[in-house]
């Protein structure tokens, strides 16, 4: 930081009650009142250097004590005292922290060269241009200090000059950056660096007021020099700096009762940041967008802001990670941990866009679209596995999200099966009908042999799902060409998987002996409501007699 020292005499001001008095043998003849502070001074020192005081004291006798109120002086009593000390040649230290107040106050008092040669105002202006604007952090600190005197600083051009200086340095090639800057990314300090990172400037400007930050970013973008990703990184750093719960996945962050003033500040920040996000896809990460959507709901951001965030999030949903989706629910009416409604809304927007693109593109371009939706389907199934572990997760929300994924998106149902199994394990109290609803979207034909074998033995699964798994297990185990051909014919014509016991018996071509046993299994399961029917230590063997071959399936039921 740059400093300027003016004056040679020691500070002899002292405070007595609400007055500031100078230690001197000369009686005071000038009283300056600024709000609740009174200064007892001398006309002979201040009037020659202050054009305003000279004009106010012109018609007064020299022997009279003059009292003047300067309640409107910019910077208040502190700024006036700096100017007064200069008039007494008392040492004052100026830096980016107090320069703006001193500049505005000296301008108010008309302490120019035309009033007295070598006056304070030209000295301050020279320091501002030759030192402050040449420094990186000095320019930022000075710009931030203009928030206390916005009109004065605008009229004096301080704001514009500081912004121009900051933007010029942001656009400087990293190989030429030699000034001190703040960069505290995790692990950065431990690595050896041969060059300055491209986003070296983002942390320092995050100290700025929101409006000033917006002005700097807007000015930088107007040069069309910075890539969108750098703008996005600056927005991310700023949001993390001013939203205390943005970086945390803790669910306690949303439970803190904030006052309306804090909510309004955060609401304004979210609205402003969203409007500044570059239109270029990938300018900000999907995780950043999803967390903004969550916070936008919490702070009650405008509908326009939330709609735009959901649209942007859906464009990049395939880039999301599971951690990105695990956003806390901040609704006081819900007990479950995760905001599944938010994920469902973004997924719905993604699917609308995907269907629109699929119908518009030629078949040659559909490979990428298919890859995209399958990647999203895997992500959603992983998300379902995570939220299934929440004991308060309603069946309806789980089912709604699992069924939102189109059939074409899931090449395999192994992940979905795992999610359903976790849900059944964590929620053993759910009814038979709810179990059926959970498994409604599960296609046993798309289960791997290993997972299907697990499903056959899974006591938690509804009987219908177990029988379907048995059916497809037989189909996959059949070695005869005719059996494979028949199975292929059955499902390539769009027919549904047999779900009732009679059609299942028919499709499996059960012989008389095995039919009775299988039917007993079905009836027993229905009567007992999915209760355990076999001992794990004494597994029963059910022999399914197909056409020309026998297949033995051991069903082990744990009590």
UniProtKB/Swiss-Prot annotation:
Modified residues (Phosphotyrosine): 417
Functional summary from the UniProt entry: May act as a substrate-specific adapter of an E3 ubiquitin-protein ligase complex (CUL3-RBX1-BTB) which mediates the ubiquitination and subsequent proteasomal degradation of target proteins.
Family membership noted in the UniProt record: Belongs to the NPH3 family.
This protein's UniProt keywords: Phosphoprotein, Ubl conjugation pathway
The protein, known as: BTB/POZ domain-containing protein At5g47800
Domain observations: The BTB/POZ domain mediates the interaction with some component of ubiquitin ligase complexes.
Domain of life: Eukaryota
Organism in which the protein naturally occurs: Arabidopsis thaliana
